[in-house]
């Protein structure tokens, strides 16, 4: 486990920051934008978790309790795992091009495939869509819509950055969006 003993260094006061290998880049560097957007998605997933756990087990109209519990269960298992994967992805993206340390935990094809399998399974539980869904709904749903739009921004930023990125990382974010 990583132990952080100091949360400030002053090293970024001049507008630069460090990559994983210790090399310095401007905070305006495309790689730093990508890492920051990945971090933003992770924070939004934390908001989704918080909002889902605030849901009552019953609806004000006496509606289906199973649905609310299912949302909580899915959020706590799937989103918790996604947060860990996004943390790993952010670390990978904070490496200089083609300089990923051997010890680093990386997103792989099984992670990308699992996303598709989970989405297919969840989709089977839903009624077919007849149109696009407007971003609204309960707290966790609205937060998930916001996370989805930031994931799409992350994907666009990754495509714009290009250099040294593993194709599976881009595929994973595309599937996540």
Segments predicted by a language model, with ranges:
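Phosphate/pyrophosphate-binding loop motifs in nucleotide- or prenyl diphosphate-using proteins
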Residues: 1-177
């Amino acid at each position: 486990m990583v132990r952080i003993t100091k949360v400030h260094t002053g090293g970024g006061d001049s507008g630069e920051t460090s990559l994983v290998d210790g090399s310095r880049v401007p905070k305006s560097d495309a790689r730093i934008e990508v890492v920051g957007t990945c971090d933003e998605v992770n924070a939004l997933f934390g908001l989704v978790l918080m909002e889902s756990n605030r849901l009552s087990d019953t609806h004000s109209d006496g509606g289906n309790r199973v649905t609310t519990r299912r949302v909580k269960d899915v959020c706590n298992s799937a989103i918790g795992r996604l947060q860990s994967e996004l943390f790993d992805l952010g670390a990978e993206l904070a490496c200089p091009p083609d300089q990923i340390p051997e010890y680093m935990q990386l997103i792989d094809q099984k992670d990308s495939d699992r996303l598709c399998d989970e989405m297919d399974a969840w989709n089977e539980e839903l009624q077919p869509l007849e149109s696009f869904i407007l971003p609204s709904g309960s707290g966790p749903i609205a937060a998930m819509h916001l996370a989805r739009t930031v994931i799409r921004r992350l994907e666009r930023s990754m495509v714009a950055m290009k250099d040294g990125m593993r194709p599976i990382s881009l595929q994973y974010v595309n599937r996540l969006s």
